[in-house]
Structure formats: structure tokens, C-alpha cells
Amino acid sequence: MDKKRTTSSFRAMSTERKLESIFLFVTGRCNAKCAMCFYAQEMDKKQPDLTFDEIKKISETAGQFNRLWISGGEPTLREDLPEILELFYKNNHIKDVNIPTNGLKPDRIVEWVKRFRQNCPDCNINVSLSLDGFGTTHDTQRGVPGNFYKALETLRKIQENFGDDGKVLKNIATVITKYNIDQIEDFMTWVYGRFRTSTHTIEAARGMTRDDGVKILTESTLRKIQDDISPIYSAYADRMVADTTGLRKPITRFFYLGLIRTLYNVLSLIHI
């Protein structure tokens, strides 16, 4: 990560121009060895992360914006992540924050979400948990034995602690590779039936991956997957608008399905 370039880019921002979102790369460290990681070569260089003071300068110059997207590496390895989130809540009045995680630290995640809900009560927090398939499929893809059950433990503990909290959202994120391509539909169906997740996003492996040969997908294959999982996303849409009434119900459902299709096209098909 080029710290000087990142910092200078934010210094150049005009605080008079309101941003919608900021993507913040908080660490290059990771406790997994994902086969499809497109940042592996950069992580191997072990470049230093942005310091808290550097991130503070970003917050102080960004002005108000709505959504903070945390990125890495594995964000839960950043010890001061709670302070970083609270910084942007106080200075920038964020309304939503998204945190991706491999779920290897379930207790830390739950502890941090509790702290965030207490100190940032008006902000939604979305925990985006990586799950790529059943059991050993997930562990093989992530390069960590037992990762699957750790991730499930994380998801279960989030449900137990925040099940009725509408400001704590749970999203499952799956990356399509040669390891899981034959179980995407079954896996998504299983996740939908077992957990009260907000949604389940999928994307194809992209970039210079750690392991050669994980990106075996063609446009026709991705189109077929899109068609196969369409009923699952319809079920997610129905779940989302279950308590919605009037004209808002079909409109919300329509835009949700359109957004999901657009995300799939951008995150997967554009990389073929």
C-alpha cells in the first residue's frame, strides 16, 4: 500500500463536496491464505499500514459522508479498529459501516460490534462474513483448516447477540473458484434456510491470484450460475420486504433484485 499516495489523495479532497462513500484499507495483514487472494503479492511485501494519526487526518479532511467500507487484509487484526470506526462516526457522521471478515476471531468480532452499537448508536453496521462452500471446500479455498466452523461460530454468535437489532446486519460473501463452482446453488440455498442473513453476495475470483488455476470461469458459466441462483435472490427479496406494505413493497423488491444483478455483473462478468 502506498501510504503517501493514499494520504495525499484525501488531502486533495474538498470538504465542501459531500461524499457518499469512502473505502478505507486498514491493514495488509491477514491470518488466512486464500487461494484466490488478488492482494497476496502486495501482502508478502509487508508494507506498513496507515497509522491511526494518518487515518485521523483522512477523517478530518473528508467532510460528512454516509458509508464507510472497511477493507484489508483481515480488518479484525487491526487492534485499533474500534477507535477508527468511532472516529469516523464522530467526525464524519457516517450512517453505515461495512466490515468484511473471515470469521476466525468470533469473540473479538462480537465484542467490537457490541462496543460499536453502544458508542455509535445511530449507525448501521454490516458484518460481511466470507463463506465459500461446505466444510473442507471452504477451508481449502481459504487455506485454513477449521475456518468453516469458526466462520459459522461467528455467524451464530452474531445472531445470538444481535438477532433483534435492526442496525446489525449480516451478509455472506462467496468467491467463485474451481473449488466451489459445483456447489454454489446448493450452498446458497443452505445458507438462506439456516441463517437470517441480510443477503448473500457472490463474485468470481479476479486479478493475480495466490494459486494458479483457480479462475476457470467463462462468461457462459457465470451466466448459468446467475440464472441458477436467481430464485434464491427472489427469496431474499421477499424476506426483506415481508413487513413492507403498499407500493413501497414492489418498488423495494425491484430495486433490490436490480442491484444484486448489477453487482454480480460488475464483480464477476467484468473480469472475464
Give, region by region, the residue ranges found by the protein language model:
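Radical SAM enzyme [4Fe-4S]-AdoMet core and its adjacent flexible, acidic
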Residues: N119-L269
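Conserved alpha-helical substructure of the radical SAM core
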Residues: D2-I125, N161, S220-D228, I232
